[in-house]
């Protein structure tokens, strides 16, 4: 198999904060992001609802005119970790040199429309994230799709089978011989930052793939990444630095080398 999938969470994995915190939350009158998230948590508890649905509901209630374009514009304010802007070009080029096609995917509990507005949106073969339904004028009216920490695993199987269309459940659930799988789990690398990524990490790692717990310079985040590695949820725990010659780059290049070597060995069977 000459393909490898690099699969990323978004918030605090490719970006140092939750995507709403850069501009959206201040724009609706909050001075502190934690106050917004507390309102979301309180709303979820009060209504006994999913936390992701709750934040989408609060965003819709607090913003006077939430549209597809408004959300996409929010993507322009999202900052990325060091090196992310050139990461894809470097890794793609290295994969090509080794005879490996690298595909990039997002599986995020954040908002698809905001991700689509970021500077790296075009780097991904597919973005799986939460989204709203819109009326004919483009106004958000209701959550259309949510991606919580357990639902994330569905999209790993979509990538595995090559059934990328979210509306195609028939082919996703149909039995597929291993030799017909689009990208085997052994050729996947999942990047995440915390406990909400554990189900996805377990699926990938238990099926022979690689998982990377990333952390920033904050002590608490570092400890969490190390805990994920200790508990064998993460194969690697690495600082969220995607720049040239960083540990993440060297690690992913090593994985690409391993896949390429395995492909060469398979030819002798």
What spans do the regions from the language model cover?
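C-terminal cap/substrate-recognition subdomain and adjoining C-terminal extension
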Residues: 75, 82-105, 109-269
């Amino acid at each position: 198999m000459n393909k490898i999938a690099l699969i990323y969470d978004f918030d605090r994995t490719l970006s140092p904060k939750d995507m709403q915190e850069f501009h959206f939350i201040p724009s609706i009158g909050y001075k502190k992001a934690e106050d917004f998230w507390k309102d979301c948590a309180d709303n979820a508890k009060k209504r006994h609802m999913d936390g992701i649905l709750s934040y989408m509901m609060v965003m819709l209630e607090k913003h006077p005119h939430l549209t597809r374009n408004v959300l996409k514009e929010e993507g322009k304010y999202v900052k990325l970790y060091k090196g992310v802007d050139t990461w894809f070009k470097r890794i793609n080029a290295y994969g090509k040199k080794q005879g490996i096609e690298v595909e990039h995917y997002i599986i995020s509990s954040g908002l698809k429309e905001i991700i689509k507005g970021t500077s790296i949106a075009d780097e991904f073969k597919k973005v799986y994230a939460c989204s709203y339904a819109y009326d004919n004028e483009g106004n958000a009216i209701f959550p259309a799709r949510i991606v919580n920490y357990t639902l994330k695993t569905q999209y790993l199987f979509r990538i595995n089978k090559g059934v990328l269309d979210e509306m195609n459940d028939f082919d996703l659930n149909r039995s597929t011989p291993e030799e017909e799988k689009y990208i085997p789990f052994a050729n996947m690398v999942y990047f995440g930052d915390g406990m909400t990524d554990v189900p996805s990490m377990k699926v990938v790692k238990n099926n022979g793939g690689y998982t990377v717990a990333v952390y920033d310079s904050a002590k608490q985040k570092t400890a969490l990444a190390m805990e994920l590695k200790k508990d064998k949820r993460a194969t690697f725990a690495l600082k969220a630095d995607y720049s040239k010659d960083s540990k993440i780059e060297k690690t992913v290049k090593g994985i690409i080398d391993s896949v390429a070597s395995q492909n060469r060995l398979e030819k002798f069977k």
